[in-house]
Amino acid sequence: MSRRVRQRVEDNGKYKVDSPSYTVIGVEDLAPKVQQYVNWTSLPYDTVFHLFTRLNYRDRASLASTCRTWRSLGASSFLWSSLDLRAHKFDLSMAASLATRCVDLQKIRFRGVDSADAIIHLKARSLLEISGDYCRKITDATLSMIAARHEALESLQLGPDFCERITSDAIRVIAFCCPKLKKLRVSGMRDVSSEAIESLAKHCPQLSDLGFLDCLNINEEALGKVVSLRYLSVAGTSNIKWKVALENWEKLPKLIGLDVSRTTIDHIAVSRLLKSSQSLKVLCALNCPYLEEDKSYSSNRFKGKVLLAVFTDTFDELASIFADNSKKPKNIFSYWRDLIRKDKSIDEIMLWIEWIISHTLLRIAESSNSQGLNDFWLNQGATLLLSLMQSAQEDVQERAATGLATFIVVDDENASIDCGRAEAVMRDGGIRLLLELAKSWREGLQSEAAKAIANLSVNAKVAKAVAEEGGISVLADLAKSMNRLVAEEAAGGLWNLSVGEEHKNAIAQAGGVNALVDLIFRWPHGCDGVLERAAGALANLAADDKCSMEVARAGGVHALVMLARNCKYEGAQEQAARALANLAAHGDSNGNNAAVGQEAGALEALVQLTQSPHEGVKQEAAGALWNLAFDDKNRESIAAFGGVEALVALAKSSSNASTGLQERVAGALWGLSVSEANSIAIGHEGGIPPLIALVRSEAEDVHETAAGALWNLSFNPGNALRIVEEGGVVALVQLCSSSVSKMARFMAALALAYMFDGRMDEYAMIGTSLESTSKSVTLNGARTMALDQIKAFIKTFMEHQIFSTGALSSAPSMLAQVSERARIPEAGHLRCSGSEIGRFVTMLRNPCLVLRACAAFALLQFTIPESRHAMHHASLMQNAGEARGLRSAAAAASMPREAKIFMKIVLRNLEHQQAESPEGMKVSYNRI
């Protein structure tokens, strides 16, 4: 099981315009034996224009390729007044190709320095608005060139990430080159000098909205000289000299709104501003620690003034802006948007408030102290974000959705979210709203809404709500998007939803499997986020038997192997290996195990991934090899590709690794050791000492799996002797006596039984007489210790009263009681080969009575009807004619009492089984 939450990350998309040519044929009338075709070129132009406006750029290009008339309409400047290039690779060549369409371009949104450099090549002299994000690398030279080429510019916004390379020099150039500038918002500048601000005051007489956000230093006095300002934001700016600021800002004659959120302002400064500034109507001071220290502070005495702070009710405060506020609607934003008679001045204020609140809430959500504002988020923050998601301003909608995706995250790396916040979003109708945004034709909204849905879906209750509202189909459709950012977030949503067993089949039925596989083929290189999320979702889906077959049918095996072989991104490698592990984990219920092994390069790639420097990659690769080793051909191929050496090396280096890695490397060695040749090779490579060390682990999964590996290895006399010499007997005896896991104790007992069934004695005698005598003494002591522990282990499953009665009775009810008392449920997952079963049947005739009892106890575990492979084991015994030998052993006078009782149960089990299962794989564990 795995999932992932995401916060806002920097990424650049890759854009490719696909322009297929379609033959569009429609039936107009269906008269008998007559069929007429619609002439689509005769559609009214306004209808065609409406179609174009509802499409993204890529789909516009496809539609325009339909015919010459539509190609001409598709190039109309009416459709190219606004461009959002954030999701595309916008470079010089693309700028040149778009230039002829952008003569009348008025608004552009871009992402990153490469796109910024290319803007001037659009030759859009009439450009009015420029908005850019991920601007950390943009320099003064680039920004100055943009300003110089667009003298009609009225709005320039760069952020919310920091513009670290932009200085006051660029601001001066903007002021000089763009005299019509009305709005300027820049984030993260180090210093904003007085000269730069005074240049704005001098050359930009219409400048009414100014924001220097998250800056280090600004000149407070100079800001007081920009007398045209109606709205000023210095949110997040450090080192503000409040005395100087107050003296100058309170005199600004037109200042209506001031945003000082996330600054060091205190209640004294707030009171002075609200009292002294005659024009000021709205003061936003969210997340201001010094202001919030005074718990008794109230702004009620400042009539006609609105204070937005953590301790005020934002909706009530904003209601006072409206003339008729007696009803005070619950959601003032919805009330304002629904007003029939609009007030231009109020609209201007509310639009600014939407922008600054959405920006501040996102910044708070991203900050480390977000958890300290839990009451704020639960009481009004979540509701504010949902309200802002309904804004008419697209950037506000996106920022609110991003904030929603971020504020619920507690720990990104460990996929942990705040359940209270997530459920608050759900209670306020957030799921339905997000899904509506995800259906928008605007790809920016699709991306941010999908991200929020993905993060919220970490919570099981929210995931259920998403599914019930049709969210799975929405995400599956978005995963097919040609916009990489949209597809990436949608894949993340499917990844998180696919954790729930109840959602897996729904995802497959919605076409999610095909969409996820196609993503890997569509973006095989340089799109790490897409690949990791698609592979992660497929890994979760592959854990389900039916869905795993769907993944295979969709070409998932080939896609995942390609990813494991060629991708260099560790996150994608890890998820690809996990997906292959889960595909191979269904044993003989489907053919995926063999299919993965037969895929060219699969086994070799997984062996190579066990040598990755990244622990997660090594862990999942080892897990995949563990499952694949169930297949005889896979097992030998893994060894041929150096799997034994690689896994032994990994085991040797895993002493300080995670328990997950330790378990999987032990499991992979367990699976490979089924083969006698591999078993010997593991011993020769030095695999026994690290496995003994893992047997001593306190983690049940680790020591249980390591004991299983030693069980297989111990059948070889040479390995058995190595286990003795390396102190393995003591480790196994301790495990057999103290582990909480019955399964671990059982396998430790079986390993000890194999070691001391007499075959090792002859092997140990090889060498000089002195060495042989020494070995004999050592073995005798180890044998006594081992047999005593095996006997004690079996006794723990023998209740005196039940066994006393069982020895005298063969009544089914009595034998059922004994069987239930002796049963180890986990042992039902073990699947033995015919030779393995034969070893235990042979052990029934061993001179050692303890080993006879151990063999009978093991055969009981393998044939209990409730066990997964009981029918298979019964079939092996019946086909080999073992029933007669079992009856003879059960009737032998020398057979211990407990062994006789166990054998009665085994014979009864055989009578109830039908020989239907073919011979399968040998002893090992199946895991998902």
From Swiss-Prot:
Signal peptide residue numbers: none
**Does this UniProt record's set of keywords contain Nucleus?**
yes
Primary localization class, coarse: nucleus
Cellular component annotations (GO), alphabetically ordered: nucleus
Q: Where are the ARM repeats?
A: 147-186, 237-278, 303-341, 370-409, 419-458, 460-499, 501-543, 545-585, 591-630, 632-674, 676-715, 717-757, 824-864
Question: Which GO biological process entries does UniProt record here?
Answer: lateral root development
The UniProt entry annotates the motif Nuclear localization signal at: 3-8
**Subcellular localization(s) per the UniProt record:** Nucleus
The segment(s) forming the F-box domain are 37-83
Provide the family line.
Belongs to the beta-catenin family.
Tell me the function of this protein: Promotes lateral root initiation and development, independently of auxin (IAA) and abscisis acid (ABA).
Q: What is the protein name given in its UniProt record?
A: Protein ARABIDILLO 2
Organism of provenance? Arabidopsis thaliana
